[in-house]
Amino acid sequence: MPQKPGVVATMADTRHVHVFDASAVLQVGFRPSPHSSLPQALMTKGPRTTPSKPLFTFKGHREEGFAIDWSSRKPGRLATGDCAGNIHVWDMKGSSWQVDSSPYRGHQGSVEDLQWSPVEETVFASSSADKTVRIWDTRGRNGPQISLNAHSTDVNVITWNHGVTYLLASGSDDGSFKVWDLRAIREASPVAHFTHHKQAITSIEWAPNDDSSLCVSSADDQVTIWDLSVEAEEGPPGDYPPQLLFIHQGQHNVKEVHWHPQIPGLITTTAEDGFNVFKPAINVST
């Protein structure tokens, strides 16, 4: 939860969604050791905390799912999506949560990703294996406000720009990613479309300190950084698009990329063989 980082939500193949308070675990993990520069938790063998019960468990999803996102605008508000195409919205009530009695329906395939609007607490976006991106408003239950045929294959991931809040980016199973202007989304034409990656896009995120920078990971074992403020060059296209600033390699099966919210340019990637933390020698912020 952005407003309380120790509170986390998990979703597994049991179809259940759990909310945990991991504050104690985080405090242990960052307690300094007097004999090492590493956190004490990394130097100590064996269990360091007792297992804790979840604060809340929701068992209403019909199938397992992957999509989950906390709202940055309304504390405790959570959206979860499953492989049956259903989306549930949660709201915190006191020390517990209240989940909507009926899900948001509209997708004809698995809900792959969810993103709350950075400015509207009732608006969220979803992407699906049905090749669409949809925009929803919790104030209405008559289906999505906007349905966009975004890609020719599954739309795996989406990211909402927190600086230029009408920009949404989507990444697909075919390795392409697109940027959409929500002010003109009914035209169904992206403002940018890139096909550098040759396998499925697995993660995508706008930089929090630079409205024009994106980080993208793919099943082709590349993590790329893009600056969309760079204009296309005249003449025949080269081997690499001019907007492509940096390629990070060396990891296998990269699943997620995240920018550090306070340190400009610092990126964390998680993969099958571990995680990397790095800062490219490029200027991605001013």
Can you annotate each of these PLM segments?
Residues V17-A22, G29, I87-D91, V133-D137, ...:
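WD40-repeat beta-propellers
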